[in-house]
């Protein structure tokens, strides 16, 4: 098993519901360490750059609009198989299809306002972590 880092974003809908602590408790209960964290209100440019991979998709504008609608909580998580573990904790993208007890089943309202983002692979995790935490802001514990 490998120690990995992954990026997690608690999206504006979940921040507004005041469930950051409950989501953090799930990360920690699953053995994931929060090695960097910050709350920010993304600019449109930052959101467009971060989600550039989806630029040609029909949902891109709505995704960007949603991500700039309020503050987000961004964290780098570290642990054994952190990427898969975080994706399991999040549940399916559509909260109606997410397993009971997952973050999205418990806190998300729709496929758009789906509470959290998580890196989907090691390559994207590395790019996403460095996008929000360039260099010295990530601390191994």
UniProtKB/Swiss-Prot annotation:
<feature type="binding site">
    <location>
        <position position="114"/>
    </location>
    <ligand>
        <name>ATP</name>
    </ligand>
</feature>
<comment type="similarity">
    <text>Belongs to the NDK family.</text>
</comment>
<feature type="active site" description="Pros-phosphohistidine intermediate">
    <location>
        <position position="117"/>
    </location>
</feature>
<feature type="binding site">
    <location>
        <position position="104"/>
    </location>
    <ligand>
        <name>ATP</name>
    </ligand>
</feature>
<dbReference type="Pfam" id="PF00334">
    <property type="entry name" value="NDK"/>
</dbReference>
<dbReference type="GO" id="GO:0046872">
    <property type="term" value="F:metal ion binding"/>
</dbReference>
<dbReference type="InterPro" id="IPR036850">
    <property type="entry name" value="NDK-like_dom_sf"/>
</dbReference>
<keyword id="KW-0597">Phosphoprotein</keyword>
<dbReference type="GO" id="GO:0006241">
    <property type="term" value="P:CTP biosynthetic process"/>
</dbReference>
<keyword id="KW-0546">Nucleotide metabolism</keyword>
<dbReference type="InterPro" id="IPR001564">
    <property type="entry name" value="Nucleoside_diP_kinase"/>
</dbReference>
<feature type="binding site">
    <location>
        <position position="11"/>
    </location>
    <ligand>
        <name>ATP</name>
    </ligand>
</feature>
<feature type="binding site">
    <location>
        <position position="59"/>
    </location>
    <ligand>
        <name>ATP</name>
    </ligand>
</feature>
<feature type="binding site">
    <location>
        <position position="87"/>
    </location>
    <ligand>
        <name>ATP</name>
    </ligand>
</feature>
<keyword id="KW-0418">Kinase</keyword>
<comment type="function">
    <text>Major role in the synthesis of nucleoside triphosphates other than ATP. The ATP gamma phosphate is transferred to the NDP beta phosphate via a ping-pong mechanism, using a phosphorylated active-site intermediate.</text>
</comment>
<feature type="binding site">
    <location>
        <position position="93"/>
    </location>
    <ligand>
        <name>ATP</name>
    </ligand>
</feature>
<keyword id="KW-0963">Cytoplasm</keyword>
<dbReference type="GO" id="GO:0005524">
    <property type="term" value="F:ATP binding"/>
</dbReference>
<dbReference type="GO" id="GO:0006183">
    <property type="term" value="P:GTP biosynthetic process"/>
</dbReference>
<dbReference type="GO" id="GO:0004550">
    <property type="term" value="F:nucleoside diphosphate kinase activity"/>
</dbReference>
<dbReference type="GO" id="GO:0006228">
    <property type="term" value="P:UTP biosynthetic process"/>
</dbReference>
<keyword id="KW-0460">Magnesium</keyword>
<keyword id="KW-0479">Metal-binding</keyword>
<keyword id="KW-0547">Nucleotide-binding</keyword>
<dbReference type="GO" id="GO:0005737">
    <property type="term" value="C:cytoplasm"/>
</dbReference>
<keyword id="KW-0067">ATP-binding</keyword>
<keyword id="KW-0808">Transferase</keyword>
<dbReference type="InterPro" id="IPR034907">
    <property type="entry name" value="NDK-like_dom"/>
</dbReference>
<protein>
    <recommendedName>
        <fullName>Nucleoside diphosphate kinase</fullName>
        <ecNumber>2.7.4.6</ecNumber>
    </recommendedName>
</protein>
<comment type="subunit">
    <text>Homotetramer.</text>
</comment>
């Amino acid at each position: 098993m490998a120690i990995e880092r992954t990026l997690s974003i608690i999206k504006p809908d979940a921040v507004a519901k005041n469930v950051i602590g409950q989501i953090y408790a799930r990360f920690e209960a699953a053995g994931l360490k929060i090695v960097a964290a910050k709350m920010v209100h993304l600019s449109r440019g930052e959101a467009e750059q971060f989600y550039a991979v989806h630029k040609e998709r029909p949902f891109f504008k709505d995704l960007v609009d949603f991500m700039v609608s309020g503050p987000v909580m961004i964290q780098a998580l570290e642990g054994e198989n952190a990427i898969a573990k975080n994706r399991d904790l999040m549940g399916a993208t559509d909260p109606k299809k997410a397993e009971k007890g997952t973050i999205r089943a418990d806190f998300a309202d729709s496929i758009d306002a789906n509470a959290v983002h998580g890196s989907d692979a090691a390559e994207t995790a590395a790019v996403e972590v460095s996008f929000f935490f360039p260099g010295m802001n990530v601390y191994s514990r």
